Amino acid sequence: MQRRHFLLCAMMLLLCPSVISHAEDALALGARRELFIDHFLIDKMLGVSLQLQKPQSGGVALKFDQPWEGQVSGYVTVLQDGDLFRMYYRGRPLTGYGDNDPRAQEVTCYAESRDGITFTRPSLGLISFGGTRENNAILADIGHVTHNFAPFLDTRPGVPQSERFKGVGGSSESGLVAYVSADGIHFQKLQEKPIITGGAFDSQNNVFWSDHEQCYVCFFRTFKNGVRWITRTTSTDFFNWTPSVDMTFGDAPNEHLYTNQTSAYFRAPHIYVGTAARFWPDRRSLTGDQVASLKLDEAVNYPGLKLESSDAVLLTSRGGDRYDRTFLESLVRPGTDLKNWTARSNYPARGIVATGPAEMSMYIQRNYGQPTHYLERLTFRTDGIAAVHAGYQPGEMLTKVLTFAGSRLTLNMSSSAAGGIFVEFQDAAGVPIPGFTMADCVELNTDDLARTVAWKSGADISALAGKPVRLRFQMKDADLFALEFVK
């Protein structure tokens, strides 16, 4: 890469008054991984941009084609438990029928996989449906709980083995009722009274243990001024919860977020990632002829199916009551299949999981309310939900002042053969640090999840650990997904 291409960008950044910062305001990164999924680390960008990545289809993960599942199955959770992937979802063949009609019976179903790609249904023999127990249902006939039961793997230190799995489900009438399990299949009610009340809860309500905040966090459904909203509450013991607080979204427009699907990101658990369903009531996309061709009026007793649409968006949080919506555009679009332009199609499952050495997956419902209803797997590069992107014309990114612990800096990055990345350390005032300047850096021209940055003197940066510094990146035809300081 020609360094002269960067001179103008470098001078503009260095001369900008906003690069001056107080050392006491430094971000304390320690040795953790940071994703470029928001502007948390970024102070200035010139000739580069923060871009949302688009997932690729990994094919069908599961078809909802069993008698106890069907066209309105939903509220899917995928958990990675060691080398086993566990999937939970509501099974319900049809809607719009009486509670005593088997077509409207709701059950909680369980499937599993060893690779996160192909899921199978174990015959568990726990629940009778249609005169047989040969099915994968684990809960049934418990009021509103099986409408939206959402388990999680409790990672709190010291949690009893008998409560390694927890889950909640319910409605505004019942509150959120908690269940526990040792094996993720046999669930028992934790207590008779609900653990959380005061919400609408008529969606998927997600709980997890946050190492970052040292508490359980629950994100649940409420309404605010007629808009489907997300509210949060916390607890240190899972029994006693703080007064709920509505989440804020900064300057983002108020949109119906039907599900939040929020959990701690598995490679950087201080970052919460939500793959939310964005619902557009009364926004009809299908013409009358298209409705007729899809036979939607015959598919299910649900008139709204043809009148509404939905897609998926990205939410992030670093704790507290604020969601960041850096990217307002869709994370997942309905696509060219007309069957996905119906109400409640394109609802993501909760859970982003590792499905390969350089791949992670999310899952999304397709063809909701129709006989072809299925769950699709979508893949990202590991850490690759978003990236700082430079085109062929070089650009720069400057971080805020930070401190770190460690002796090496690694980047999750990708470049073309023509492109690459250079890295410079600066002091808090923006002055390049001798030995770690751009001129000293060995160009990173590669595609790697953890490429170590080196300078003429080597890769050891331990002399800078604990000191307030900035990182300056020069980039050409490259993407920067994440960085990590390694001890």
Regions found by a protein language model. Name each.
Residues Q2, V19-S21:
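Intrinsic low-complexity/disordered segments
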Residues R3-L7:
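N-terminal export leaders
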Residues C9-S18:
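Bacterial N-terminal signal peptides
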Residues H22-K487:
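Carbohydrate-active catalytic/glycan-binding domains of CAZyme proteins
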